[in-house]
């Protein structure tokens, strides 16, 4: 059986964002699997995405070990593949939250030699609002939604480059977006494995 991972954890970028480079031992095998999945359009995100699909037990175990080191226990993980082409657009947002659980997102970049600026960025709104909890406290969701596509209203506080076989994990309550899209089809587009990770403190 092939070894699945090279699990080298890098220094955290911020309290809420960290990276594992060279996550898969054989990333082209995972990429080939992703290329052969069925993708569908949905109204709530750009690009096309698979349904929630089977997750490799080894990946689950690695994530479980990683989050335990932060005193967090995984309750569930939703696992998808997604790709976006250059003719699509994105917006700044936070992900849906299950109350009583903290939610993290994970992205594994699966396009070889991708543009470095095709990664992921975290943002702060002009009023200092950084996440859904701030938005609820300040009761300014209408302003946030109205300006989700206006970059002049946001300050970029972290960005992560699109490096093949890199996993980035971040707190999905925080405002974020993909950066540049690229490519024309699944073969050369921004292909990724997308994880939504639901955790609770130990």
Regions found by a protein language model. Give the residues of each.
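Catalytic core of non-heme Fe(II) oxygenases with the double-stranded beta-helix
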Residues: 87-202
């Amino acid at each position: 059986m092939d070894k699945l991972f090279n699990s080298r954890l890098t220094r955290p970028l911020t309290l809420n964002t960290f990276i594992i480079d060279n996550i898969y031992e054989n990333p082209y095998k995972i990429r080939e699997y992703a290329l052969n999945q069925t993708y569908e359009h949905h109204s709530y995100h750009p690009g096309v995405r698979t349904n929630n699909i089977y997750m490799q037990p080894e990946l689950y175990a690695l994530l479980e070990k990683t989050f335990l080191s932060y005193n967090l226990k995984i309750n569930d993980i939703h696992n998808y593949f997604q790709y976006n082409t250059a003719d699509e657009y994105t917006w700044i947002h936070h992900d849906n939250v299950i109350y009583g659980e903290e939610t993290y997102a994970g992205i594994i970049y699966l396009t070889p030699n991708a543009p470095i600026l095709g990664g992921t960025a975290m943002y702060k709104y002009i009023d200092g609002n950084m996440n859904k909890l701030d938005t609820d406290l300040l009761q300014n969701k209408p302003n946030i939604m109205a300006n989700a596509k206006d970059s002049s209203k946001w300050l970029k506080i972290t960005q992560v480059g699109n490096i093949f076989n890199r996993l980035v994990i971040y707190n999905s309550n925080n405002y974020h977006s993909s950066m540049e899209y690229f490519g024309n089809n699944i073969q050369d587009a921004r292909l990724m494995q997308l994880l939504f990770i639901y955790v609770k403190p130990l």
